[in-house]
């Protein structure tokens, strides 16, 4: 989509984003998880989707090849789909194991000074109150826009996913990433500033790929 936007600007043509149909049933996400944004100045949009009866396995060969061409190592179908959609829409996504989300709540709020958090790479990160976190009813589960936590990571035993697509403040992500010494594919995209409207299309695309 980034190339399409640049081409539209270069040739002075209107950019027409792809239309991705919403998949799933009539159940509401709110029946499974409550999302609360406490620091709206740092998170202009947060879209969540619940995916049940998940089976972890390898992603299709065509997807693995495309990810490899982008310099991304294929891992499994769920991680690969979130990475693929990130490259396709320039919209980072994250997947949580919903069964590990305490109280069925997602709270977007700043960290407390001196808090420590173990990220997916197994490193202990020292936080401060300028950093935005994704929390459940009891604990932080991700550093917003940068990296998820070990305490809610996807394993082969996952049954129900909580997918996240959000729009976090680019300046805050850049400063937090620098303080933590942790720059990721996701943070590098957020740093540039994202269109909040892309989140819904991206999460619909991810669900479409999961259903396939």
Briefly describe each language-model feature range.
Residues 1-212:
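RNA/tRNA-interacting regions in translation and RNA-turnover enzymes
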């Amino acid at each position: 989509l980034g190339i399409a936007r640049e081409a539209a600007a270069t040739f002075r043509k209107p950019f027409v984003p792809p239309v991705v149909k919403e998949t799933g049933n009539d159940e509401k996400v709110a029946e499974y998880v409550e999302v609360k944004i406490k620091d709206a100045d740092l998170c202009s949009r947060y879209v969540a989707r619940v995916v049940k009866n998940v089976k972890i396995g390898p992603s299709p060969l065509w997807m693995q090849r495309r990810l490899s061409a982008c310099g991304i190592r294929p891992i499994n179908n769920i991680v690969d789909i979130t990475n693929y959609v990130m490259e396709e829409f320039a919209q980072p996504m994250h997947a949580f194991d919903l069964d590990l989300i305490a109280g069925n709540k997602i709270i977007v709020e700043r960290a407390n000074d001196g808090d420590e958090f173990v990220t997916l790479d197994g490193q202990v990160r020292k936080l401060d109150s300028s950093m935005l976190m994704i929390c459940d009813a009891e604990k932080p589960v991700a550093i917003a826009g940068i990296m998820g936590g070990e305490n809610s990571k996807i394993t082969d035993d996952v049954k129900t996913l909580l997918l996240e697509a959000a729009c976090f403040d680019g300046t805050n992500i850049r400063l937090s990433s620098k303080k933590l010494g942790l720059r990721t594919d996701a943070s590098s995209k957020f740093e540039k500033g994202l269109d909040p409207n892309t989140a819904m299309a991206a999460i619909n695309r991810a669900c479409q790929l999961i259903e396939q």
